[in-house]
Design a protein with these regions (language model features):
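A short alpha/beta connector and helix-capping loop motif
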Residues: 80-99, 196-198
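A short, small-residue-rich loop immediately preceding and capping a beta-strand
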Residues: 63-77, 92-97
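Alpha-helix C-terminal capping segments
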Residues: 8, 29, 54-63, 83-91
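Active-site diphosphate/adenylate-binding microenvironment
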Residues: 1-57
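Conserved thiamine diphosphate
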Residues: 110-171
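Glycine/aspartate-rich loop-and-adjacent alpha/beta segment that forms the canonical ThDP
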Residues: 150, 165-225
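Short gly/pro/ser/thr-enriched loop/turn and capping motifs at secondary-structure boundaries
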Residues: 23-24, 45-47, 75-76, 100-104, ...
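A short, conserved beta-to-alpha structural element at the edge of catalytic cores
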Residues: 89-116
Length: 225
């Protein structure tokens, strides 16, 4: 999905992220065409940074398109700023990678804490029904709290949702054609998708893990690859 965003974006697009797995995927997969086009909180870990930063980029960007790539957890820290985006005429385009969990925290709990999941399930998308929890409305429809499409529409923005690759491509194309108001696309992402490579907390960067159980081969004497 991030690769599709990059492929369909204009060369002068300003890219903004929140904090989480989506931030890492964006850094890995976006093909930046120009310098000074990347705004992210980096190692500060400031969840909620994305939307306010994207609004600022849109207001001060001299008409350059702005794509915010955010996660459902990070986005909800400052989602009320959709009102500011609407009233400030900041037509930001929001790609919401909705895996219904705090994905980065869940990844750590999977890899280092024996899959003991604590306080990571948001129940706003694909993860409802997990751990014995099942919420229903009208007898058969899973409850999503919040429904991000309705949330966007409540703030005067355009809301869309994509479950498949074809739907994602179509939504991105449509979003790129809308320039008079903010747009939010709720992309459904598998909750157990992980970011690779990674370095565990407290470990040296030399101790990088490429994939589960796969680390670089090194010479014991020189430390060379």
């Amino acid at each position: 999905m991030v690769k599709q965003l990059s492929d369909q974006a204009a060369d002068d697009t300003l890219w903004v992220t929140g904090v989480g797995q989506h931030q890492m995927w964006a850094a890995q997969l976006i093909d930046f065409k120009r310098p000074n086009s990347w705004m992210t909180s980096g190692g500060l870990g400031t969840m909620g940074y994305g939307l306010p930063a994207a609004i600022g980029a849109a207001v001060g960007g001299n008409g350059r398109p702005v794509w915010l790539i955010d996660g459902d957890g990070s986005f909800q820290m400052t989602s009320e700023e959709l009102a500011a985006a609407f009233f400030d005429h900041a037509p930001v385009k929001i790609a919401l990678l909705n895996n219904s969990v705090y994905g980065m925290v869940r990844q750590w709990q999977t890899l280092f804490y024996g899959q003991h999941y604590s306080a990571t399930n948001l129940l706003d998308g694909e993860a409802h029904g997990e751990e014995g929890v099942k919420l229903e409305a009208n007898g058969d429809m899973p409850v999503e709290v919040p429904d991000f499409v309705k949330l966007a529409e409540a703030y005067g923005c355009v809301g869309m949702r994509a479950f498949t690759k074809d739907e994602a491509i179509a939504c991105i194309k449509k979003a790129n054609e809308i320039n008079d108001r903010p747009v939010l696309i709720d992309f459904r992402v598998w909750k157990d998708a992980m970011v690779w490579p990674m370095v565990a907390a407290g470990a040296s960067n030399d101790d990088v893990t490429y994939m589960p159980g796969i680390k670089p081969l090194r010479d014991d004497t020189t430390g060379e690859n």
